[in-house]
Amino acid sequence: MRILIILSIILCSFFARADLEYIDNDIYNYNGGRNENGCLEVYDPYEKFNRKVFAFNSVLDHIILRPLAVGYKNITNDYIKARVNSFVSNVYTPLTAVNYGLQLNYDKTIKSVWRFLINTTLGIGGLFDVASKVGLQSDRQTFGSTLAHYGVAPGPYLVLPIIGSTNARDMTDSVITNYAINPLMYYTHNDFDLGILAISKITDRYVVLPFSDYVMKNSTDPYVAIRSALHRTREASVQYPENFKCPKPKN
């Protein structure tokens, strides 16, 4: 059973990226201009390799992950989806607190800790987002966000077998890294941790169903469309140091 759970988590990584939660599925506006000093141009020196892996991952997504996301969409109502999203978000809040601590942003570190404590207790294990109602909003941070905070540019765009789309900097946001530095994971059973990871990937994939379906059916080049969307939305979600300038790729 544990092997099946692990395989499910791995196979749920193709399109399911937390970065995509920033995409507006209604208007398909992928302009990441909110971060004016970010790296808005994609650096893709390995495009030939990336396209081959993208095609491979797309087939597996069509066979495995997309059906799971569609099933989740069909068998759960909006209330259940909201509870699942709130619960998963709460599990990853300690990870956000750790990364804010690494960024020396102690105000947001403390707020993240309070958010976790409030939602875990008053929110019944995180099923309800009580903290947002008292001004403690969700603001997910990853180790890639922390690296960006210290001026690390995204680097080359990469599409890895099974892992999916990422870049040199955000490879640190793999399942293994986020799993390792989330303090909550050290106090819970392994099967629980794996289950949370699998559920989070399925819900992430559900969120981007309108986007991915639209691109696959209408885009003349789905690879470019998805690459642009992932890159720009990720750049819009990180905060670079003041006066940061994206380095120009070497020819």
UniProtKB/Swiss-Prot annotation:
Superkingdom per UniProt: Bacteria
Q: Which family does it belong to?
A: Belongs to the MlaA family.
Keywords, comma-separated and alphabetical: Signal
Q: Name one GO cellular component term.
A: membrane
What's the name of the protein?
A: Uncharacterized protein RT0044
GO biological process terms, alphabetically, are:
intermembrane phospholipid transfer
Q: Please tell me the species this chain comes from.
A: Rickettsia typhi (strain ATCC VR-144 / Wilmington)
Q: Where are the transmembrane segments?
A: none
The residues the entry assigns to the signal sequence are: 1-18
PANTHER family registered for this protein in UniProt: INTERMEMBRANE PHOSPHOLIPID TRANSPORT SYSTEM LIPOPROTEIN MLAA, LIPOPROTEIN VACJ-RELATED
